[in-house]
Regions:
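Core dinuclear metal-dependent hydrolase active-site scaffold
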Residues: 1-52, 133-197, 322, 326-329, ...
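Active-site metal-binding loops of divalent metal-dependent hydrolases
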Residues: 8-9, 30-33, 87, 163, ...
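Active-site-proximal loop/helix segments of hydrolase catalytic cores
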Residues: 161-166, 172-175, 179-205, 212, ...
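Cap/insert and terminal regions of metallo-dependent hydrolase folds
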Residues: 168, 191-276, 362-365, 385-454, ...
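Hard-cation-handling environments
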Residues: 231-373, 382-386, 421, 436-438, ...
Length: 535
């Protein structure tokens, strides 16, 4: 058996694993790269396999960094089944067509500009028709149901507790007289999240392909409901708006659950709450109609409210672009939840444009912000940012509420692995930026006394029973993190030129500041030298 790592290697997005067993090929996940423009460009590269030779896909959950390239896979010849849970299929039915609309729109925009410059016509990465054909291939399997993927390979989905429908994959592989047990974690949720059940206890495996999104972090143990209430109350007192970039699937529904609870307890005022994302609207409806995946508390609330999980008179779902734009014309404080969660596309850009410059407004991030995204730049303290072609000063208060993460942290992952009956032979650490992957790998080695490996793009693990060896990729492939660093440094160069011009203008008006500015720049220069010495 061979496992080739074709995404989420030393980065968080693009999950894709190619498995070869007894002459049969199948994938676990087929995700899209997300982040900066240079990282997104990896989606344009050819697959390192022939899609027509892939016999099946096992899909852990609906998030596009795990499912987003399925339409491209179908476009290029894949015709096999895509196995997933019921809720995952329902969520993909909104996520994949939406992603296809974006691809078509970006291609149309590029072609309008390109025609004037005489450039070659750009084809979309995939189309809405490709997404529809991909969805037609989905085959539903229940949690706990064992099924065959290809000869010799049996898979069972277990509750991952990340988002609705999310699963980790228990896999049994038989080759001749050799048997191997594998676990692909997908994304493991942190315990005690609202609405959905906690991750199930895994039965054990010889090898685990693990995520490491928060492999170097411990979620803060604090009263996040109280903090959310404080932010809302402070913002309302200032007369501003609370703008929340939120993932349409999972995070939006959790936030609504909390707002309902805080309102019922009288801890926040009943100001208008807008969910301004057609995708989030549909995802909320899907969440409402799958109570079998709720935890005990959510089931009780669902029954008490007449088979409705969320019921607030001040909650509004906007559908049209006109309704979305009208929100910013409505006087008074309001809460706006909009996508995308990393603020790099979608209607949220419109709300950021209208609120970032306002000192009375608050921007609340309640999820992971990948390198290169607008969300990441805002939580890192950027003072000016370009949104929708307009240079905007950041005056609003920026909050980064990490406690809402749908990913388990390092301690929670270690506790989950420790609950297994036996220690695996090795962990392959993926789906995390390099520092996170390295820290989790180190902790796994020290705490469990097992081997760990952090694959590069294209690396291949060859496994025979419980024996394994790695074959490092000979491909010339730049790591996504390195691509993103290059883009970030280009941004630094651009900012430096602007800053230099401003400094020269300031000193021209105030020559007495020249000495002070020189001393500060000398300190900065020395700091940069020290950074290079540490590398």
């Amino acid at each position: 058996m061979k496992i080739t790592f074709l995404g989420a290697t030393r980065t968080v997005t693009g999950s894709c694993y190619l498995l070869e067993v007894g002459g049969h090929k199948f994938l676990v996940d087929c995700g899209m790269f997300q982040g900066s423009k240079l990282i997104k460009a990896l989606n344009e590269k050819e697959f390192l396999f022939h899609p027509g030779e892939i016999e099946a896909v096992v899909l852990t959950h609906a998030h596009v960094d795990h499912s987003g390239l399925l339409p491209k896979l179908v476009k290029e010849g894949f015709r096999g089944p895509i196995y997933c849970t019921k809720s995952t299929e329902e969520l993909c039915s909104i996520l994949l067509p939406d992603s296809a609309h974006i691809q078509e729109g970006e291609a149309e925009y590029a072609n309008r500009k390109g025609m004037r410059a005489g450039k070659k016509i750009v084809e979309p990465l995939f189309t809405v028709d490709d997404a529809a054909r991909a969805l037609h291939l989905f085959k539903l399997r229940s949690f706990g149901e064992a099924f065959n993927v290809v000869p010799g390979v049996t898979v069972t989905f277990r509750v991952a507790g990340h988002i609705l429908g999310s699963a980790f994959v228990e896999m049994s592989v038989t080759e001749g007289d050799k048997k191997t047990r594998l676990i692909f974690t997908g994304d493991i949720g942190q315990p005690n999240q609202p609405i959905i059940e906690d991750p199930a206890v895994a039965g054990g495996a010889d090898f685990i392909i693990t995520e490491s999104t928060y492999g170097n972090r411990i979620h803060e143990a604090y009263d996040k409901e109280g903090e959310l209430a404080n932010i809302i109350n402070d913002t309302v007192e200032r007369g501003g708006n609370v703008i929340i970039p939120a993932f349409a699937v999972g995070r939006t529904q959790v936030l609504l659950y909390y707002f309902q609870k805080l309102q019922a307890e009288g801890k926040i005022p009943e100001i208008p709450i807008y969910v301004d994302s057609p995708m989030a609207n549909r995802a909320t409806q899907i969440t409402m109609t799958n109570p079998e995946e709720y935890d005990e508390e959510a089931r009780a609330l669902y029954a008490m409210q007449g088979r409705r999980l969320v019921s607030m008179h001040n909650l509004r779902f906007t559908a049209t672009v006109q309704e979305s734009m009208a929100i910013n014309e409505i006087p008074g404080s309001k809460i706006v939840i909009s996508a995308s969660g990393m603020a790099d596309a979608g209607r949220i850009l419109h709300h950021l444009k209208h609120n970032l410059w306002r000192e009375d407004s608050s921007i609340v991030f309640a999820g992971y912000q990948a390198e290169g995204t607008i969300g990441r730049r805002l939580i890192e303290g950027i003072k000016r940012i370009k949104i929708m072609g307009e240079d905007i000063r950041v005056n609003a208060k920026i909050y980064n509420m990490k406690g809402f993460s749908a990913h388990a942290d390092k301690q929670q992952l270690l506790a989950w692995y420790s609950s297994m009956k036996e220690v695996p032979k090795a962990f392959f650490v993926t789906h995390g930026e390099l520092d996170a992957a390295m820290e989790l790998a180190d902790s796994l080695g020290r705490n469990l006394g097992t081997a760990t490996y952090i694959p590069h793009f294209g690396d291949c693990a060859e496994i025979h029973g419980t024996e394994w060896q790695m074959h490092e990729s000979e491909m010339v492939q730049v790591e996504p993190a390195a691509i993103d660093l290059r883009a970030y440094m280009r941004g630094m160069e651009h900012d430096y030129l602007l800053q230099r011009s401003k400094i020269e203008q300031i000193v021209a008006r105030n020559p007495d500041k020249a000495v002070m500015v020189r001393k500060k720049l000398e300190k900065l220069h020395k700091y940069m030298d020290d950074i290079l010495k540490d590398l």
